[in-house]
Amino acid sequence: MHRFVTEEKISGVGEEILLGKEESAHASKVLRLRPGEPVQLIDGENRYDAVLTDVSAEGTRARVTALCPSPEATAQAVLWQGLPKADKLELIAQKATELGAWEIWPVEMLRSVARLGKNDSKKQERLSRIALEAAKQSGRAHVPEVRGAVSFEKALKRLEEEPFDLILVAWEEEHALPLSKAVEKYRQSHDELKRVLIVIGPEGGIDEAEQQRLATLGPRILRTETAGLCALAALWTAMGEM
């Protein structure tokens, strides 16, 4: 079934929704849909069944017929991704969205081959588009925000402004816990786990100096042996979400 992202929040069943210009054009000119065809609508919080009532490039409309069961996990998992080589970040944005990431933070780290540059805003737009399409294809109710790429220092500053219950750092050296054990350890002393940050380094991994800086954030930091996008899947498994 075709899915469309709405520009407004949906209040409930029976409401008629006007799609934005881009989605309207996609429905009419690319997919060539017709009134009466079933679709699904995503408003950033929920996913709804709907039926098209009017199809045109100027404004496609759909009437909401049912609220779908939420496909989203109970916790929000934010992916801090050390800048990888070339276009690898595009694949990461796609797969992270499919695996349920809430946000994606590209971060320049000491071992990053790719560096911040003047075309970063265009890259962000491209990554946001990839996340949008991946969310639609995978049936997400939420489209992850892809933040603009920042330096390691600015990412640390962001953590001061945006608190997390738990920060999991993928660490390939010794003394790292299996991710499932890290989550279990946290839940032994906390009732809820609402917001998690998963820190993944670039291809060369996370530098020791960066590990030490992250460690200063306190006891909510746990080093895990799970690296890459496997960390997202492992998190949901540990929380009983898969």
Regions found by a protein language model. Give the residues of each.
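Fold-independent oxyanion-binding glycine-rich loops
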Residues: 7-8, 21-22, 44, 83, ...
